[in-house]
Amino acid sequence: LAAGLVSCGLKAKNSNSGEKDTTEAISSETDKKLEKLESLINQYYLKDVDQDELQQGIYEGYIAGLNDPYSVYYDEEATKSFQESTDGEYDGIGAVMSQNKETGIITISQVYEGSPAEQAGMKDNDILYKVEDEEVTGKDLTEVVSKIKGEKGTDVNLTVLRGDDREEVAVTATRDTIEYPTVSSKMLDNGIGYLRITEFDSVTYDQYKNAYNDLKNQGMKGMVVDLRSNPGGSLSIVCKILDEILPEGKIVYTQDKNGKEEDFTSDEEHQIDIPMTVLVNQYSASASEIFAGAIQDYDLGAIVGTQTYGKGVVQQIFDLKDGTCVKLTIAKYFTAKGQDIDGKGITPDVAIDYQADENNPEADNQLNKAIETLQGEMQ
């Protein structure tokens, strides 16, 4: 246990006054206390002890001691899931599942178009009843999803309940590599293209390019980019997309603990030639704010919606070489014009709160305002 902690220790500089190395002192005291705690647990603790769980708890607690919500230790299972989410793809059946906390019922909330799940006959709102003849209601959702995922080309047998009469339907899906759909698009009236980005993952750039080119081929003359509730993602991917939009210049820059700055820039090869607006809300964070901030700094379109989240820091993943990893905050970022948005967010040019319409669930007053604003620029 102690060795794992020491290997993750934060190094402190020795002072010129000959004082004891702070890191060594902290590590030594930590070793002693851990040994004492281990002795007390072995001697007095009533219940059985899972040593793996205990060890993981130490690592998690060590990073939690930084009091930084963005710095996190991931165990092996969490590391694998995190890697899948950042890669934007996984081997599975292509269905999004949610679980009712009270009943334990697992529902198929979305079946991806063209996925193995769709080909097997699964539908949105099906209830997942069995996986390989084992009932899953009330089981941990993460464990259930892990059983459904598997090697590409292998089959998984599922039973779903469908409709009000809960008809039992057996399906067999052949697992394949599934790409998370992070970009969706459609043409609206009057030559306005709508493009929604839910996250900036490894697959997002190609999905953006395909969606943008498809809208242009349909005659798009103005574009609404919807980043509402987009939590962020990859710094390099959002910069790659912005390189397709901005003129030559700085996109964003970062500054580490030593004051070292790194610029991320766009070249002169690409630049958007149509007006645009960007939709944001209080859940638009990190890479979403980099996108909105760049559009705002270059005056390429109005930012519409509410104040964004205010996550102006950058994290890096460090592989711990044992199947686990740690994510640490390593720098702050600033927009091209030097805006520090950490804890503040991006202030929209056109402020408007979302208002639900009970008579028309499909109504979207924020989108309507973005379209209205864009039409003013298109005239």
Please identify what each model-predicted range represents:
Residues G88-K130, E134-G138, S202-Y205, K332:
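PDZ/PDZ-like domain segments forming the peptide/carboxylate-binding groove
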Residues L1-Q99, K130-V131, V136, L141-M187, ...:
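Intrinsically disordered, Ser/Thr/Pro/Gly-rich linkers and terminal tails that flank
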Residues Q315-D319, V326-D357:
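Conserved P-loop NTPase
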Residues T103-Y112, E167-T172, V252, C325-K327, ...:
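Short, well-ordered strand-loop elements centered on a beta-strand within folded domains, enriched
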